[in-house]
């Protein structure tokens, strides 16, 4: 999604509610969730001031899991609509994590915005050993 001053996610943190009701500029089905952008993430998307919303469903065996989220700039991770990671500011590339007990089917949503320059977004999930 493209954003402007009126829909800037830092000034209007609920902007993704509006974005999710609009047609996306680009959709990219992926198997591995890691992106690094020095420019536009896809045709038709500007190089700076863009936002992404990523969703998936998955099923796991019972256990403790570590969810890792790499981001530059802001990112939020929701599991079953519960906010687990909230790094919603302009920052250099960093990794945040949350440890959770899971079993069965779940929904994951990652919201991300890029303010300018380099941008990265990645997600990994691993069992806690």
Where are these regions (language model features)?
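Extracellular/secretory pathway-exposed regions associated with glycan biology
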Residues: 1-66, 70-129
